[in-house]
């Protein structure tokens, strides 16, 4: 498709723009229309079957029905489940308005289970509170809502645009004024001016990668890719609790819930493989998930939903609910495995991570009417941070947002041109390079990083690596290619997922404590810290474009809860959260510093457009004789000669070795480098002929250090060099050449010549020499070297060379060296030392603070193989380090 001009955008106007036609979005549209507003409802799929609700629903999790539950009890329950970090005013809206919403939905045609007396059949699932209200025909809820939207009085006020996907909320004068997006079937650019905007795009369900590896095999509806999180963030709204992930128990290998809360009233329950109940937590929370995860990982796992003990009528009733309402494909899944609830309990596992305000607490910050921190921008449903809000809460806040937004009329000013251009570029960028990396590959890589570095248990190091990966992937995402409007939609979703991934990683870094059980388990900050962190963690996009954070104290509760006493107070501005320095051997101010190496300036290659380049490269497609390359290898253009060298390397005709060696003397550094790489690449198949040896010897004495080092490596590999030649290059000014000379001397067993390198000015050369020397006499001077790594290498080599009494005494003394590398080397040396000296010293070393030193001691004790050594090893089987434990256990 062609990129449409920005000037050709289709412009729509409304009083209230609702983005997302799922649970909250449909209710927001209905309420706003009932209040007299002209509503535009945008849905990137089709409203009739979009959103999480369309995947099936078996009941209401949080129905506060008068006579069966009290609003204040529910508020307290949710406060405890969320470890005290809640805005009770929002939770109380769901508690007090939920029953009226049930009745409203019932008036639309949604069916809720009732008993013989016509009373709502509320079930008790947890050890306190009765909030679960089954919906025997929950699969039809979206159909009922769509029917309501299509009523004549609603059609007069609500315009539905299916297959239109907003990508950015437009703002002017600090408030929301519309949106920009595109049509996912035609590709047309669409702009909307609105008096208010309600975001109801659901969770970010496509954040982590499912265990199956399927991009769309997620627990949540996979079309919910975090669109609203990203749009709210870029519009300047605050998000909060993003570090509190959504993680759910599910059926193993199936992207749907096990529905233990449905089975519990029938007598089903979760058990480990021994049939034992194991969940101590009293409410569906991160703490429950922590218990669940621990049980799965223990020798008591796997974990099951036990149903096989139930009577036939209970099983039949459960089948009628579970196979037709929540995930209707469930029955097919079990049948495909030959499983039946009567004979097989259901193996459970843990879902991938996601962001969801309605099932955990990660969402857009809203007040008790769904208002965000950006005027006239609202959020509702799973996108909004109203902890454990579930379906009824989504309906309630959709209603609240729609009612409040209906106060505003359409924006009449100019839509911001800079924001329109940015949105246009975001949408159509993949069309500019249609052959770029496809969305599935880029998305898979992105979400694999989420699993590897962001999913709990979390640590500062892994989260820091996550930030690094997500920052780098901005470029890869910008290079994605697309050819159709549908592919454009998927590419845009990947940008949303990346934004959410970065928010998740940085938020998790910012909260330096553990809270919410498994949802935010920090291995480097394992304790909950209410004094410092009984705070909401808010994030926003600063005016400079950086992601910045604020710790906002929890306001005093409306409903007191034992164990928590928030007092509010002044927010603590944290600013940007920077990743820790990781992926290095240690802090750079303490790491060993190598010798200065001459800087090699990369060769700048002038652009060449000679057709002979293509001709030379084309030679590799056939099986040419060496003579076919001659003219190209001597072409005046170095780019042609480089291309000829590459083709020659690829085709490798007879005589390739001497031909490449001849190019080592080329006048152009790029050609010489290509020839060096070619020889190293082909070294295993080269014929060690005299002509090649002559060319290599000549090149090893040339002016190019890269060529000299490469020529020495090929000489060594082909056994064409000799000790005098290698020894003569031990004084070469380039470190890499001297290292190659050391390796050459080792290859011809020239120990006497090798000793000359023990005084080399470069640490790297001395270390290589120490590792190669085979005589304690030759190694002794290096034990006094001023560099710790050289001493460590020398002691390590004593293990193979033999460690006589006098050197064993020195090794024992070296166990107290400040450098752990030296201590580890000394411990290794003692493996070949006399037992009376070695074993007592090694036994003491088992308490060294460095794990690698302890590991070296264990390995040396195993080599000693005396009763005293075995006694010492028995003490190390409970060491904190896995390697130490493993080797000690092998005795």
Where are these regions (language model features)?
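An anion/pyrophosphate-binding glycine-rich loop and adjacent beta-alpha core
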Residues: 231, 237-347, 404, 408
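Amphipathic alpha-helical scaffolding segments comprising HEAT/armadillo-like alpha-solenoid repeats
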Residues: 598-602, 622-632, 653-665, 685-699, ...
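Conserved redox-cofactor binding core of oxidoreductases
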Residues: 49, 101, 106-193, 203-210, ...
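Short hydrophobic core segments
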Residues: 17-19, 192-202
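N-terminal Rossmann-like FAD-binding beta1-loop-alpha1 element of flavoenzymes
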Residues: 16-40
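Alpha-helix N-cap/helix-start positions at coil->helix boundaries
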Residues: 607-609, 638-639, 669-670, 705-706, ...
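Glycine-rich loop(s) and the adjacent beta-strand/alpha-helix scaffold that form part
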Residues: 199-257, 391-404
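Glycine- and aromatic-enriched mobile tails/lids
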Residues: 2-13, 35-37, 46-48, 104, ...
């Amino acid at each position: 498709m062609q990129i449409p001009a920005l000037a050709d955008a289709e412009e729509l106007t409304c009083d209230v723009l609702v983005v997302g036609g799922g649970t909250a979005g449909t209710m927001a549209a209905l309420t706003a229309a009932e209040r007299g507003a002209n509503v535009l409802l945008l849905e990137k799929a089709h409203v009739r079957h979009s959103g999480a609700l369309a995947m099936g629903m078996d009941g209401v999790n949080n129905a506060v029905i008068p006579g069966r539950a009290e609003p204040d009890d529910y508020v307290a329950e949710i406060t405890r489940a969320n470890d005290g970090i809640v805005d009770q005013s929002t939770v109380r809206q769901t508690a007090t308005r939920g029953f009226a919403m049930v009745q409203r939905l019932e008036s639309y045609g949604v069916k809720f289970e009732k008993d013989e007396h016509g009373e709502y059949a509320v079930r008790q699932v947890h050890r306190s509170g009765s909030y679960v209200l089954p919906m025997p025909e929950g699969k039809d809820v979206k159909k009922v809502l769509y029917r309501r939207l299509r009523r004549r009085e609603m059609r007069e006020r609500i315009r539905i645009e299916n297959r239109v996907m907003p990508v950015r909320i437009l703002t002017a004068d600090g408030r929301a004024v519309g949106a920009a997006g595109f049509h996912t079937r035609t590709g047309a650019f669409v702009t909307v001016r609105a008096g208010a905007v309600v975001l109801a795009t659901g969770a970010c369900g496509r954040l982590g990668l499912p265990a199956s590896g399927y991009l769309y095999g997620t627990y949540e509806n996979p079309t919910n890719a975090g669109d609203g999180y990203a749009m709210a963030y870029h519009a300047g709204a605050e998000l909060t609790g993003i570090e509190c992930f959504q993680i759910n128990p599910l059926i193993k290998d199936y992207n749907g819930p096990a529905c233990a809360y449905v089975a519990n009233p029938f007598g089903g329950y979760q058990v480990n493989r021994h049939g034992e109940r194991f969940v101590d937590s009293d409410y569906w929370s991160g703490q429950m998930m922590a218990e669940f995860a621990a049980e799965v990982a223990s020798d008591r796992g796997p974990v099951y939903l036990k149903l096989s003990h139930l009577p036939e009528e209970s099983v039949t009733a459960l089948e009628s609910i579970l196979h037709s309402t929540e995930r209707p494909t469930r029955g097919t899944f079990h049948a495909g495995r030959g499983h039946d609830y009567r004979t097989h309990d259901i193996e459970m596992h843990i879902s991938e991570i996601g962001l969801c305000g309605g099932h955990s607490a990660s969402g857009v910050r809203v007040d008790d009417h769904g208002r965000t921190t950006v005027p006239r921008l609202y959020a509702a449903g799973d996108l909004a941070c109203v902890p454990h809000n579930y379906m009824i809460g989504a309906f309630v806040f959709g209603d609240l947002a729609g009612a409040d937004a209906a106060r505003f009329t359409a924006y009449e000013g100019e839509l911001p041109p800079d924001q329109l251009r940015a949105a246009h570029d975001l949408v159509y960028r993949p069309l500019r390079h249609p052959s770029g990396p496809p969305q599935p590959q880029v998305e898979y890589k992105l979400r694999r990083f989420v699993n590897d570095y962001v999913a709990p248990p979390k640590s500062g190091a892994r989260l820091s690596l996550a930030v690094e990966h997500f920052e780098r992937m901005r470029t890869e995402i910008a290079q994605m290619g697309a050819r159709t409007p549908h592919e454009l939609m998927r590419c845009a979703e990947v940008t949303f997922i990346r934004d959410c991934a970065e928010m998740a990683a940085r938020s998790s870094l910012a909260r330096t404590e553990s809270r919410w059980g498994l949802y935010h388990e920090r291995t480097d900050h394992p304790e909950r810290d209410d004094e410092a962190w009984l705070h909401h963690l808010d994030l926003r996009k600063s005016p400079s474009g950086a992601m910045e954070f604020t710790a906002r104290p929890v306001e005093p509760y409306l409903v007191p809860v034992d164990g928590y006493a928030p007092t509010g107070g002044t927010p603590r501005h944290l600013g940007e959260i920077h990743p820790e320095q990781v992926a290095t051997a240690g802090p750079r101010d303490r790491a060993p510093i190598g010798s200065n190496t001459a800087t090699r300036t990369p060769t700048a290659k002038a652009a060449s457009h000679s057709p002979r380049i293509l001709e030379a490269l084309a030679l590799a497609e056939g099986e040419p004789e060496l003579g076919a390359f001659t003219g190209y290898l001597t072409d005046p253009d170095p780019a042609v000669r480089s291309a000829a060298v590459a083709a020659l390397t690829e085709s490798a005709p007879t005589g390739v070795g001497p031909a490449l060696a001849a190019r080592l003397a080329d006048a152009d550094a790029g050609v010489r480098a290509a020839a060096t790489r070619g020889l190293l690449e082909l070294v295993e198949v080269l014929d060690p002929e005299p002509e090649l040896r002559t060319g290599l010897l000549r090149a090893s004495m040339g002016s190019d250090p890269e060529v000299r080092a490469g020529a020495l490596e090929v000489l060594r590999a082909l056994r064409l060099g000799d000790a005098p030649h290698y020894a003569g290059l031990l004084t070469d000014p380039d470190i890499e050449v001297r290292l190659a000379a050391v390796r050459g001397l080792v290859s011809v067993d020239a120990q006497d010549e090798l000793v000359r390198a023990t005084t080399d000015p470069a640490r790297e050369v001395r270390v290589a020499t120490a590792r190669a020397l085979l005589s304690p006499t030759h190694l002794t001077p290096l034990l006094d070297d001023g560099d710790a790594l050289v001493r460590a290498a020398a002691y390590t080599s004593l293990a193979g060379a033999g460690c006589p009494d006098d050197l064993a005494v020195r090794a024992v003394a070296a166990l107290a060296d400040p450098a752990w590398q030296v201590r580890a080397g000394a411990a290794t040396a003692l493996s070949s030392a006399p037992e009376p000296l070695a074993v007592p010293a090694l036994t003491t070393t088992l308490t060294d603070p460095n794990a690698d030193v302890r590991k070296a001691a264990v390995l040396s004790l195993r080599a000693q193989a005396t009763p005293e050594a075995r006694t010492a090893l028995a003490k190390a089987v409970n060491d904190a380090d896995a390697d130490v434990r493993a080797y000690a256990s092998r005795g």
